[in-house]
Amino acid sequence: MKACFIGLGYIGLPTAIVAANRGIEIVGVDINPSIVKQTNSGKSHIVEAGLQDLLHNAVRSQKLIAREVPVKADAFFIFVPTPINTQKMPDISFVEAATRSVIPLLEPGNLYVIESTVPVGTTEQMADLIYRERPELRDKLYIAYCPERMIPGNALYELTHNDRVIGGINEASAARAAQFYSKFVDGELHTTNTRTAEICKLVENSFRDVQIAFANELSIICQNTGIDVNTLINLANLHPRVNILTPGCGVGGHCIAVDPYFLISQFPEETTLIQQARKVNTYKTQWCITKIKKSIKDFELKYKHRPKVAIMGLAFKPDIDDLRESPAIDIVGEIMKLSNNTEIMISEPNLIQHQIFNLIDYNESFRKADIVVFLVAHTPFKNLPNVTDKVILDFCGVYK
């Protein structure tokens, strides 16, 4: 079988690599020439444990080839971004563009699957688009939706071991899609209709957002009452039916920080809890900014000179290089606006460089700093000493 994967980003590339290593012939398509060139050279543009070796194997065996345009295949998969606009409305234009790019290549019996996160009803909408452009293919294609279920940092394991939800426009489509995924997914495959599969993805991430909001709200309460939030959570979690998450400086990533808006935009009257969770998590980022600014001001008043501040972490979660929707980026951007000549040192051990911020080795920035701000609990940070001669702002539980 030959499959064409449209989009070689944080989901498309790992999926293509895993499928290729299971013997499926994969043509990976991306409009970014640099990604295509890098992939064909066997070098991953994504930091992910184990991915580089598997990519090298896939390219060497010629099971994975990257191109800038799609080609004819037995199956087509859509892995493109679905961002939200400034009005917090989902933008499916990339999904539509990717779909239009494969419409001329479709043949009877082909499988078409969307993995991108989409509003409820999008798969049916794309099916209508395909059939408008190619009416002769009506009822001759297998069309399905299968949301990705993996987390950066553990992508390879979750790609193969997590259960998957597969929604078809009919039972035959769901079955055909499940047949394909069974070649590289060892988890159980659950078939349903497209709308249920679409909303399932949105519900999963909205639920996580609500959970995180609870933890973040607790951290603010504890700060105002002189209670250590990590101690509180550890004790509360001793209850067999309680599992409070670790608070952070907000919520990032292209899923949890974004997907709730897909439900909110479609069901504004029915999503009051989800909307409030979004407000809490957004506010937590601003709360952290206020705390950092206050610490800088307090230091200046006490010591009569400006502090050196180490900002530790830019990624949206520990031990990855993914900066999408990262609250740490927003925090650093605000702190960098301070016009008092405070020296700000930024460290992100998973990046070699950043297009805006000058990055400094985390050991050096920690050593020089008067104030250390932990925004991301990267594993290397946990080896740094919990000293008393510096102001430590641990927003993510590095020292928990």
Q: What would you call each of these model-derived segments?
A:
Residues 1-400:
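Structural/interface elements that position substrates and couple domains in central-metabolism enzymes
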